[in-house]
C-alpha cells in the first residue's frame, strides 16, 4: 500500500485529504499549521485539516516552521512514498521535497502559470475571469513553480463569490487528485514545464486591498466585492465610518457624478457612481460594530442623502 503524508490547513484542503483516505491510500501522517486563537475571545482552535485527521485517527504534526531541521525530520521519519499538499501555508524545504519515492505534489487552485500564490481564488474573481481551475504539479522550493502534471478547468459564473468558487474548486481538486495519483504511480504522466512568460501572481490579500476604489469601472467594483466575499470582505466609508460591503449589483447610471457619490436611493439599496457609466447598487452591508444586514434594513435606521460621498476619511 502506498504510504502518503498529507500537508494542508484550511477547509479547501479537507476534501482532498478525505479523497486520499477514501481511495485507500495509507495516510500515515498529516502536517498542518499550529492551533491559532480565533474570534473575539481568542479561543485556541485547530485547523479544519487537523479536525478531519483526528476523526480518522491519523497522527498530526503542527510545526511552527517546517523549514527547521527538528521539524522536517519528523516528517522524514514517517518515510512516505508520496507527499500531497493543498494550501498548507508554509514553504516546504528541499529536504522534504526530495525524499518520497513518487515525489511531492501540490493541489493548487488556479490554471498555472496564472495566479501563483496564496489567494488565487480571490484574484480569479477580482480580475473578472470567466474560468479558472485546478493544477496538480510537482513541488519545488520556488512558489508554485513546479512542473504541471494535470489540470482541469472550472467555470466562474456571473454571480460567483470567492466562497462559492472555493467550494467548487475544493471538490474539483479532490476529484482531479483521485485521477492523478494512480497515473503518477504507474509512470504514465509527462510533466510539463510552466511558461515563465505567462506567470501572474495572487499574493495574500492585504488590508489596503480590501478598500473599494470607486474610481474603477462598475464591473471592476462588482468583481472586487464578489472576490472578497465572504472573507475578508470589501469595505468603504460612509460619514467617516467603515462599512463592509457584502453585496452589490451592477446598474446603469444616467446622470454623471463623481465616483463614490450616492446617485440614487431605492428600497433595497443605494446606487453609487463609479469610474464609468455602470454604477453599483449596494444591497447588503455591515456597519462598523454591527451585524451584516440587508441595505433595506440599514436604510430604515440611516438615511444617507443623494450626493453623499463614500470612501472618504478611511
Curated annotation (Swiss-Prot):
InterPro entries recorded for this chain? Fmt (IPR005794), Formyl_trans_C (IPR005793), Formyl_trans_C_sf (IPR037022), Formyl_transf_N (IPR002376), Formyl_transf_N_sf (IPR036477), Formyl_transferase-like_C_sf (IPR011034), GART_AS (IPR001555), Met-tRNA-FMT_C (IPR044135)
User: GO molecular function, one example?
Assistant: methionyl-tRNA formyltransferase activity
Under which EC number(s) is this enzyme classified? 2.1.2.9
Q: Which domain of life is it from?
A: Bacteria
The record lists the catalysed reaction(s) as: L-methionyl-tRNA(fMet) + (6R)-10-formyltetrahydrofolate = N-formyl-L-methionyl-tRNA(fMet) + (6S)-5,6,7,8-tetrahydrofolate + H(+)
**CDD domains for the chain:** FMT_core_Met-tRNA-FMT_N (cd08646), Met_tRNA_FMT_C (cd08704)
Any GO CC annotation of this UniProt entry: cytosol
Q: Where does (6S)-5,6,7,8-tetrahydrofolate bind?
A: 110-113
Alphabetical UniProt keywords: Protein biosynthesis, Transferase
Name the protein family: Belongs to the Fmt family.
NCBIfam families of this UniProt entry?
fmt
Quote the function comment for this protein. Answer: Attaches a formyl group to the free amino group of methionyl-tRNA(fMet). The formyl group appears to play a dual role in the initiator identity of N-formylmethionyl-tRNA by promoting its recognition by IF2 and preventing the misappropriation of this tRNA by the elongation apparatus.
Could you identify this protein by its name?
Methionyl-tRNA formyltransferase
| Organism in which the protein naturally occurs | Bacillus cereus (strain AH187)
